[in-house]
Curated annotation (Swiss-Prot):
Lineage: Bacteria, Pseudomonadati, Pseudomonadota, Gammaproteobacteria, Alteromonadales
Keyword Membrane: no
Lipid biosynthesis listed as a keyword: yes
Pfam families for the chain: ACPS (PF01648)
Name assigned to this protein: Holo-[acyl-carrier-protein] synthase
Annotated compartments: Cytoplasm
Organism: Alteromonas mediterranea (strain DSM 17117 / CIP 110805 / LMG 28347 / Deep ecotype)
Cellular component terms (Gene Ontology): cytoplasm
Gene3D superfamilies reported for this sequence: 4'-phosphopantetheinyl transferase domain (3.90.470.20)
Protein's gene: acpS
Family under the similarity heading: Belongs to the P-Pant transferase superfamily. AcpS family.
Amino acid sequence: MAIAGLGTDIVEISRLGKGDTANERLAKRVLTPAEWQQFCEHARPVRFLAKRFAAKEAAVKALGTGIGNGISWQHIEVRNNNLGAPELHFSGEFAAMCEARGITRSVVSISDEQHYAVATVILETV
């Protein structure tokens, strides 16, 4: 495996909402339907949104594209495996660009503290 891209993003949690009241308009733009369901049920929705936002920003930075030019927030979904670790799942133009570049694996690390959420994404080729 070789590293094809590395991206990191940090988000100031308070920019996405106050207390337990998140910016729902932003959440609907950023989150996939499955993530939206989790967001609505989450005890700390602002933190949930901040971590998903950071992970998706880190992913597009790793790919070197940013959001736009055919790539949507909806093309990146953060899921948790059976051990609770986050995993990235790609669709649409993001998945097509990964395939075209020979990217076969992604690794994501997400963390949050009192004021910030941070994520790092590594994209790998065979």
